[in-house]
């Protein structure tokens, strides 16, 4: 039996569609006949529903997956305050322990064929006084899918994020253009610029361009993503 595959989804900023793209990847993997599970290791902005803490992003990922992980494995740290993780954690006297997340990820790999791990915010969001999401991705040692929110300034944001990922010794296995701003001028030209530079500098292919969707639909978004190409890259990536 082949070992489970996994990837880390990060973005150029917050609110640029990481959850939509993560859910779309899950739907694509399910369509490809895989047992697909999701992790949102740290979720900020949880609400109590029938005595259980829920986070909208984590719930959306569960809805897209066909393997549901136990809540403490899917989301080891569920924080109530909708704030940066280190601020929310300090407010609740919680220590965000990366070893606990790594252990949860190892457990998740035993339950599915592919595990999509969605980060929180951008790639350098603080988690503790000394660690950030880049350290988490490094600790998990996962190839990274970069979600680029297509809006003014996205070229610099994308290239800076790709540079930060590579600086940690991690591979940008591909990127997704998500058209968060339907009024953006010259979106195709921006995508062409990023397609050229990310491929040339980081060997990172464009996995798809998701149009502005209202309402957001992972199933529709999945039709715009090349999960077959992504799976091939994951299977041939150095371990």
UniProtKB/Swiss-Prot annotation:
Mg(2+) binds at residues 19, 57, 118. Pfam families: AAA_26 (PF13500). It catalyses: (7R,8S)-7,8-diammoniononanoate + CO2 + ATP = (4R,5S)-dethiobiotin + ADP + phosphate + 3 H(+). Signal peptide: none annotated. The active site is at residue 40. Homodimer. This is ATP-dependent dethiobiotin synthetase BioD. It comes from Paraburkholderia phymatum (strain DSM 17167 / CIP 108236 / LMG 21445 / STM815) (Burkholderia phymatum). The lineage of its organism: Bacteria, Pseudomonadati, Pseudomonadota, Betaproteobacteria, Burkholderiales.
């Amino acid at each position: 039996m082949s070992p489970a595959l996994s990837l880390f989804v990060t973005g150029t900023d917050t609110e640029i569609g990481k959850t939509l793209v993560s859910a779309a990847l899950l739907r694509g993997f399910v369509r490809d006949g895989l047992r697909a599970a999701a992790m949102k290791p740290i979720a900020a902005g949880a609400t109590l529903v029938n005595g259980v803490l829920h986070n909208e992003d984590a719930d959306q990922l569960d809805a897209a997956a066909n393997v549901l992980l136990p809540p403490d494995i899917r989301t080891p740290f569920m924080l109530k305050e909708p704030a940066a993780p280190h601020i929310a954690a300090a407010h609740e006297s919680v220590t965000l322990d990366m070893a606990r997340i790594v252990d949860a990820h190892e457990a998740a790999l035993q339950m599915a064929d592919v595990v999509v791990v969605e980060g929180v915010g951008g790639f350098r969001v603080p988690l503790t006084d000394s660690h950030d999401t880049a350290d988490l991705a490094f600790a998990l040692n996962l190839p990274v899918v970069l979600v680029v929110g297509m809006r003014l300034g996205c070229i610099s944001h994308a290239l800076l994020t790709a540079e930060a990922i590579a600086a940690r010794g991690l591979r940008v296995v591909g990127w997704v253009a998500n058209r968060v701003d339907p009024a953006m001028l010259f979106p195709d030209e921006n995508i062409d610029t990023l397609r050229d530079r990310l491929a040339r500098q980081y060997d990172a292919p464009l996995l798809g361009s998701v149009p502005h969707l209202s309402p957001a639909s992972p199933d529709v978004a999945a039709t715009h993503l090349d999960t077959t190409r992504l799976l091939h890259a994951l299977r041939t990536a150095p371990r």
